[in-house]
Swiss-Prot record:
Gene: MFS1
Transmembrane segments: 52-72, 94-114, 122-142, 155-175, 184-204, 211-231, 252-272, 283-303, 333-353, 360-380, 388-408, 417-437, 453-473, 527-547
Organism name: Pyricularia oryzae (strain 70-15 / ATCC MYA-4617 / FGSC 8958)
Protein name as annotated: MFS-type efflux transporter MFS1
Gene3D superfamilies in the record: MFS general substrate transporter like domains, Multidrug resistance protein D
InterPro entries for this protein: MFS, MFS_dom, MFS_trans_sf
Residue ranges, annotated region (Disordered): 1-47, 558-577
Membrane topology, from the record: Multi-pass membrane protein
Domain of life of the native organism: Eukaryota
Amino acid sequence: MSNEGTNTVLKNPGSNQEEADPDSPSSLGDKSKLDELADSTSDGSQANSGRGIAFWAIFISLSVTGFLSSMEGGIMSTALPAVSRAVNAESDYVWIINVYFLTSAAFQPLYGQLADIWGRRWPMLSAVTIFAAGSAICGAANNSGTLIGGRAIQGLGAAGINTLVELILCDLLPLRERGQFMGLLFLFIVVGSVLGPMLGGIIVDKTSWRWIFFINLPICALCFGLLFFALNLKHRRDDNSTSLQKLKKIDFVGVLILCVAVTLLIYALTYGGGAKYAWSHPVIITTLVLGIFGHGLFIAFEASPWCSNPTTPLTLFQNRTSVAAYTLEAVQILVSWGALYFLPLYFQSVLALTPSRSGVLILAFSISYCLSAAIGGGLVTKLGKYRLVHIISFAIMTIMMGVFTILNRNSSLAVNVILGLIAGVGVGLPNASILTAVQASLPDSLNAASTALFAFIRSLATVFAVTIPAAIFNSRFDDLLSTSALDNDVKNSLDLGKAYQQASPDFLHSFPAPVQDQIVGLYELSLKLVWQVLIGIAAVGVIASLLEKDLECRTEQTTEEFGLKDRDEKAPKKSEV
């Protein structure tokens, strides 16, 4: 058994003093309480084998809520053209998507803090209510400004949902058992992500686009009802504080800095490298630099004496295991979403498959991804270890991105299906256990802050996962296009980022065979560079997983502040809400 368990204490050679392992939660939290768990967590014998009705009621309500948020995240992908035309969005159409990601990312750390101050129940119910209000505004919108405003409110609600669903599950389960339930929760989220685009297309074709948003209202009502009755959770932190005292503890300045920084970054990534601005344009350079500086300023403020109650305490970064695990989450999102967006581009531009056939092929990757996440979470629960799972997973990712570089127009459909299945295993296996690695080195009292930061990194990485490969692809394609022998009319239809939009068999078949061959060759070479960049990103994941310590997964909670309320506990007083 490794000596790097939750209660590890390292002795300094040549000294009688004991030095706490910085990766051990006992060095960061309640040491005496954690030390009492040393023997009980070593063999996992105290892991609970069964769960009561109260737990399953909460788990089902969280799963339905997670399904709702993930479905909304994808439903606009197929409906955006129709919605944009209906509200005359014109060039503002991109913000119908991006403002949702902006607010859902920027406010996640705030929800973690609110959950610590007010408990989990009311922030969660508020998030569902805000999401429903945003959906209603979007559905009733008659212009792009109202629609974008509604989407911003939707994202504000989604920020709470995405953070608190995982956080509440962490409160209910000891560390060792979280992986398998996170895997099950992920199944609901993936189903929502898969159904979202399909449902968006059906609604636009068969009914009014407004039902893309109005359909959320009955689901929100169901979620609110389930959560209202199921979330019978305790909260014993600051019970005697008044509402005004609690408000004063919110890190408003930090949240404002983060919102501005995220907005600047997303603006630069949205407009850079397109028809409006080149990457070298002063506007893009300025917003990008200010966005990066803003994130640095946010970290500096959180560590400063002016921030007495930070949304993101630097304690989260004071050991290598949590830092490595946060890095793994960013890498996993960058690689998985990069593959999810650019494999269909390969299918449609190089293999000249229709969007429907492309969708069928990508199912191999998606299904493997989904099932592997559940299996990976179960493995970590069974073994009580996560490091080996992560090393194997990120090694598979790196190898598969390398294999993708040799894909070309002659690759068979069977080969593509098999490669998709293997790649799905690589990106799926670690999905439900990376948060476990983060929290293995931290006390359970930091669950809210660590989960909120985890969700924020995931959301921001999702934006980068599309924009970074797209910028690389467009830049490479434009360079190759400028030196090709294609005539100017063909070049004008493909330059300045239009190659991604034109990736379809209909576009290819509109040209003579020799021209088709040249265009396909440009796509092959441009995609090859994307896969090569993803190789490097995945390799960072291998290095980060090697830097992790394989800390013991605790089989008992180390805090009694949160979790299921005991039967004999009274309902909270109004002052506690």
